A protein has these predicted regions:
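Bacterial N-terminal signal peptides that target proteins for export
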Residues: 1-8
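Bacterial N-terminal signal peptides
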Residues: 9-17
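Sec/Tat signal peptide C-region and signal peptidase I cleavage site
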Residues: 19-23
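N-terminal maturation segment of proteins
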Residues: 24-612
Length: 612
């Protein structure tokens, strides 16, 4: 008996030592802290359960969480797998609901909200029965194969083994698609067909790697056989999706109001009503067109409207544009006006040492922005690589943060390199890498954009780092471009024009996202809105609509995230006046992580209180 009394006394003393603040107050308050510790531990256990579910049922995503054992597998897309995964997630959802959120430590309440929403979203995805309705569900397997080309995940031989295994598993994915899909949306089938085509064309890169790195002739012959089979499966899936895309009467590809609002709330933490979403989209579009009008002004001054300025030192006179009076009755510009001016500009771009030069320019930008007190000093190096062909068919560049618990975590930025003959290479370089486009890319994706942001957030806790809200992450990319403009990195008239157009494109894409999935736009309505009302080229309009279809809510998250950051920045600038330090503000924001936008204000307030 005395032994137990002594043990309890020691426990009490140790707890009091850990929480000295309570010793002078309520002695029973210590048990509140114990409750908080227990709830925090329960949250960590729930997070571990979620990762275990990913590893068991969704190996493609487990790879992105850093689980090397998942790299040789693709998801099994069958009703039995979905039912088992659903039961596991529902059990976890119940456990999360039973937690006492009010007892969490303040730092964990946000993590709780992130994990809870994540599980809700996973369950919603399974309940949509994408097995039978969504061809894009199967093309995620292509992403999983090519994801292995983006990171050095393990020993080279083991990584090639994983690449070979996933390539071989594409046959099973093709079989599952044919067995499960029942009259899916023709438009979704078209998008799947395009991805299958890109995967087929790009597979030569996988085939070449596996064959050239084979250890002996026998292994090389085996690699040739397996890669030929994989290419055949990709071609067969392309033909199958093509046939599905030609069906006449198919289900609607739009989410509809209920599901769209669910996605916004549980993936992006955007909680506005449908009417508020539509009004905000209209407001942003109007503001973007006004800003584009202002950015176009330097390019719309004719020779007759330029004034000759005689310099005092006797050097040659220069022409300076007169300040034009804005015609208030003139219609606001559209994308067509931007295209007209862009075609007049003598844009150029070098194709020499592209990767090295971008990395060097990023470091120069980091030094410049640090000197201007826009960001904290940052010494790279910036890891810039060639974008694998599969992704290059769909985008000009791609930033990839570390894969979760990756053994040797790396931040990687991939750039599409120009291909084809000399003329084609030059044309692609001018499109993707002209000086102004290059600056926007560096500012938004490298520094102070996603790359810089990811490195600064390496110390964040597991839940917040792995399951952060896309809204602030995407908004930061826009905020980074405007920060670079404010600091004088994006400075020329052409730079400002390109940024104004990019903002306009984002506003138009968000408007399509909202109106498409709320049922206000059909595909034809969206095309008319983009091409006729807003002057976008048909190819660009198609990209916007396809992106909104494949990733509902993503386009909207950019302006919402940016406005959240911009509003808080303005608040602290006004509050602190001359004491405001932009680099310090940005560092505090990044130190918080990608939390729900509505919680950022309070979290930032606490960050200022705790780090004075």
């Amino acid at each position: 008996m005395n032994k137990w009394k002594t043990l309890l006394a020691l426990v009490a003393v140790s707890l009091l030592a850990a929480y000295p603040a309570h010793s002078a107050g309520d002695p029973f308050a210590i048990f509140d802290d114990i409750d908080a510790m227990m709830e925090d531990n329960a949250l960590m256990e729930a997070s571990n359960r979620y990762e275990s579910i990913m590893l068991t049922f969704f190996p493609e995503r487990a790879t992105l969480l850093g689980f090397e054992s998942a790299n040789t597998q693709l998801d099994t897309r069958t009703p039995a797998r979905d039912q088992a995964a659903l039961l596991a997630l529902q059990s976890l959802q119940t456990a999360i609901k039973e937690m006492h959120g009010e007892k969490f430590s303040p730092a964990k309440r946000t993590d709780y909200a992130l994990l809870k929403a994540r599980v809700n979203y996973e369950i919603w995805q399974l309940n949509r029965n994408r097995l039978t309705t969504d061809p894009l569900y199967y093309t995620q397997a292509y992403d999983a194969v090519y994801d292995l080309l983006l990171k050095r995940l393990s020993l080279q031989a083991r990584q090639n083994e994983a690449l070979s295994a996933r390539s071989a598993a594409l046959a099973q994915t093709a079989t599952e698609a044919r067995q499960n899909l029942k009259a899916p949306s023709a438009f979704l089938a078209q998008l799947a067909m395009e991805k299958a085509y890109y995967a087929y064309l790009a597979y030569e890169q996988v085939s070449h790697r596996l064959q050239t790195q084979a250890q002996d002739d026998l292994s090389r012959q085996d690699a040739v056989k397996k890669t030929n089979i994989a290419r055949k499966n990709l071609k067969n899936m392309f033909e199958y999706f093509k046939a599905l895309s030609q069906q006449e009467e198919t289900p609607d590809f739009r989410l509809g109001e209920k599901d769209y609002l669910f996605v916004l709330q549980n993936k992006y933490f955007i909680t506005d009503s449908p009417s508020a979403l539509r009004k905000a989209a209209q407001r942003r579009l109007l503001e973007a067109r006004k800003n584009l009008q202002e950015a176009l002004e330097p390019f719309t001054v004719s020779a007759d409207e330029e004034a000759e300025i005689i310099t005092e030192d006797g050097s040659a006179p220069v022409k300076k544009a007169k300040k034009k009076k804005r015609n208030k009755k003139a219609p606001l510009p559209t994308a067509a006006d931007f295209y007209t001016i862009k075609n007049r500009l003598a844009l150029d771009a070098s194709t020499n040492n592209i990767l090295f030069s971008i990395a060097q320019e990023a470091q120069n930008a980091a030094d410049f922005l640090a000197d201007r007190n826009a960001v904290k000093a940052f010494k790279g190096p910036f890891n810039v690589q060639a974008l694998p062909a599969y992704f290059a068919y769909m985008q000009a560049y791609k930033f990839v943060p570390p894969y979760g618990a990756q053994n040797l975590p790396t931040d990687d930025f991939f750039v599409r390199l120009p291909t084809g003959n000399a003329l084609a290479k030059h044309k692609m370089a001018v499109q993707d890498l002209n000086p102004s486009a290059r600056k926007l890319m560096i500012a938004g994706e490298l520094v102070p954009g996603r790359y810089y942001k990811s490195v600064q957030q390496n110390a964040l806790g597991g839940i917040r780092k792995r399951y952060g809200v896309p809204t602030l992450n995407n908004g930061w990319s826009v905020y980074a471009q405007h920060t670079a403009q404010e600091a004088g990195y994006i400075i020329t008239d052409t730079d400002n024009l390109f940024l104004a157009f990019e903002d306009y494109r984002r506003a138009a894409a968000a408007a399509v996202d909202v109106n498409l999935h709320l049922g206000q736009f059909s595909y034809a309505d969206a095309m008319t809105f983009l091409t006729q009302a807003n002057g976008f080229e048909k190819e660009e309009a198609e990209k916007i609509i396809k992106s909104a279809t494949a990733l509902p809510g993503e386009a909207l998250s950019y302006p919402v995230g940016y406005e959240t950051l911009k509003t808080l920045r303005q608040k602290y600038q006004k509050k602190q006046g001359a004491r405001f330090n932009a680099a310090d503000f940005n560092a505090r924001v990044l130190g918080i992580g990608d939390i729900p936008p509505a919680q950022l204000s309070k979290a930032l307030e606490d960050a200022y209180k705790n780090k004075k």
